[in-house]
Amino acid sequence: MPVSRFAVFGHPIAHSLSPRIHTEFGRQMGVVLDYLAFDVAPDAFRVSLEHFVAEGGCGANVTLPLKEAAFEVCTTLSARARRAGAVNTLSRVDGVWHGENTDGTGLVRNLTERHGLDLRGRRALLLGAGGAARGVAPALLDAGITEMVIVNRSPERADMLCDALGEPGKVSARYWGDLGDLGNFELIINATSIGNTSDMRTFSLPRSLLDSMTAAVDLNYGSAAVPFLAWAHAVETRYAIDGLGMLVEQAAESFSLWHGRRPDTDPVYTVLHSEYGVPGRS
């Protein structure tokens, strides 16, 4: 039986659970596949993809900091990827790359189905405006978020994301220094890499951002999610959720695009959560 070759590209990538997740999905669904991880800097991404194709590669996941670079290599794009301006799933179709973004679908599915959150009518604060934020913002709006405020260390990138989303009545950009003046939010999403540079003693956000039902959600998992979720625990947000469930759900969406069948995510999530999950509240 021929082996289908897939991979995840990122920088760094040693921490990635994607090879393990897709191998487990393949075993569950009876699909024989080879799934590798490649640590590739942005300036080498296009060449690395060419080598991957030459060696039989037919699909790839893309993580930070390459999601916007992946958008640029695609000949065709899904509506979701085009709106996001970022790609996390590549499929080789008729000799060219087709780009999709499954991050937002994975996040919404994790929040609504696994954690039972109703996103309709919520006011959301999105921290970050890079590839991770771009991937989830459209799906959150589609899920019923009525107002989204985007805050980024570089305000120009927040403005660019607002423009790309094309919903000026719902989406606005503010400065990081304005956080204390924005009012409260039912949903606060960390789409930054601040967890890689902060610790539990230094990371903090204003308490004025919270109400009694605030859900604090980090798109990171493992140690990278600890500072943000430690803050969430300290201020007693109603929900504190890491990115592990989103990772598994977006992987299942990618698997379905490549193989035509969606695997059961619960068994994989349960095992990984016992090993890598950051304590939360849901």
Curated annotation (Swiss-Prot):
Its EC number is 1.1.1.25. It comes from the Bacteria. Disulfide bonds: none annotated. Belongs to the shikimate dehydrogenase family. The keyword Cell membrane does not apply. It is an enzyme of class 1 (oxidoreductase). Keywords: Amino-acid biosynthesis, Aromatic amino acid biosynthesis, NADP, Oxidoreductase. Pathway: Metabolic intermediate biosynthesis; chorismate biosynthesis; chorismate from D-erythrose 4-phosphate and phosphoenolpyruvate: step 4/7. One of its GO terms (molecular function) is NADP binding. GO terms for cellular component: cytosol. It catalyses: shikimate + NADP(+) = 3-dehydroshikimate + NADPH + H(+). Involved in the biosynthesis of the chorismate, which leads to the biosynthesis of aromatic amino acids. Catalyzes the reversible NADPH linked reduction of 3-dehydroshikimate (DHSA) to yield shikimate (SA). Homodimer. The active site is at K67. NADP(+) binds at G128, A129, G130, G131, A132, G243. GO terms for biological process: amino acid biosynthetic process; aromatic amino acid family biosynthetic process; chorismate biosynthetic process; shikimate metabolic process. Shikimate binds at S16, L17, S18, T63, N88, D103. This is Shikimate dehydrogenase (NADP(+)). InterPro entries: Aminoacid_DH-like_N_sf (IPR046346), NAD(P)-bd_dom_sf (IPR036291), SDH_C (IPR041121), Shikimate_DH (IPR011342), Shikimate_DH-bd_N (IPR013708), Shikimate_DH_fam (IPR022893), Shikm_DH/Glu-tRNA_Rdtase (IPR006151).
